[in-house]
Amino acid sequence: MKKKNILIIAALIVSICNAQTPKTEPYVPETPLWPKNTPNNWPIYHLVHPTFSYDSPFDPNPAFFYKGRYHLHYIYKNEAGFSFAHVSSKDMVHWKWHPTVLAPPTTGHGMFSGTGFFTKDGQPAIVYCGWSSKRNWIQYALDDDLNKWSKPQVMLPKGKDGKFIENVPYFDPDIWLNGNTYYGVNGVSSDDPPQIMKSENLKDWILIGDLLHPDFDEKKLGVKKSEDISCPNMFKLGKKWVLVCISHRLGCRYFIGDFKDEQFLPEYHALLGGNSKRYFAPESLLTPDGRRVNWTWFHGGEVQGTQSLPTELELPSDGILRIRPIKELQSLRYDKQTRKKLIVKKDTSVMLEKIKGDHLELKVVVKDTGEHNFGVDVLCDEQGREGLRINVNREKNLLEVGDEKAPLMLKKGQALTLRIFIDATLVEVFANERQIIMTDKPRGAEARINDGVALFSQGKDIKIDKIIAWKMKSAYAGD
């Protein structure tokens, strides 16, 4: 009888435990899909996340060109936690979503900021911060579509004493190949210096020390050495090395320099995207024809997960970084309109007839920029009001787009070409391939669409030598 009671009690305990333990279903990777009917305030040629996410950020992450397709990952948070969405494209314009396979159920941790790189054997690999793991991790692609990945391999360096360095906050890594040696960086979001390490096989890492060389010249560069370096991406551009990253205080920025004693010694520093902290978390890849193409996350956009246009970075022999939209975007153009030799009287605004729309590309050419302010109002009403102002501020040597601003040095009489991309509420402006500003003019999904374009001048007449406008097709009509 006692044995029978014991068995009954044991069975009851097992039953209670099973009832209190939640059932875990096998993880089925979701595939985000572009909605059939999107609200009219959604972009149609910027990459955005099309489905619900429980949280931000949406940093662009591992990017590759592999087996005829471009691949880009970005962070979002689904029911499983922080994951890497995966999109691919033949041209960096028309994207399709893959199953979200890089997620906590398959890796054992959340997926946070990192980068992509190729091994010495040409195999795509990713390095990233494992959310909640306090470690950085490496995984290797196991198929041509980048839908299958190896198990995570920890990236943990040893110090000079041969012991693993464990009690360090590991965060925002990057890996690149220089010669026959892999170098890796552990980014920081504090005053602690980012660390650089090296490996011959991606498994055995040796700490070198601080990423930034002791000869870092704060006065020359105009920035403190202690400014945080998050979302780092290091690559060779021309004959120099470039580090793009963010500072949580300053926003997106870049250094140009060289390596000395296996540490990075910058010669130049500037912000990328002006004073905007919304142009965030850069990530780049190398195209088959040798172009370096960069994306950033546009923080706080009307639609979650908005990425900047893919932007080519070039460093010619003059050492000045060139920033331009990729040529592949031209495939979306139609209904070309051209106007030449337009005179805008001082302190007036001129509406452009038949040039209007909220999905446009504009090219504005001014051969003599003079000494007075002028510019373009976009997304304005029929009277040229209530628009987003793009102001060439000659008095302060600034490019101002809405509330955002960036330095724009023009000599007296120097020519200027503005490339302006309007995509629903988004406005992205490139100036002389030297500056980029991205902002938006929010509107509700059912709100009236103001889509006018006007030219203005302040203080003196200005001659607009040429303005070309194209309407832009949707990039989501097919792959």
Language model features: what each stretch is:
Residues 10-18:
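Hydrophobic h-region of N-terminal signal peptides that target proteins for export
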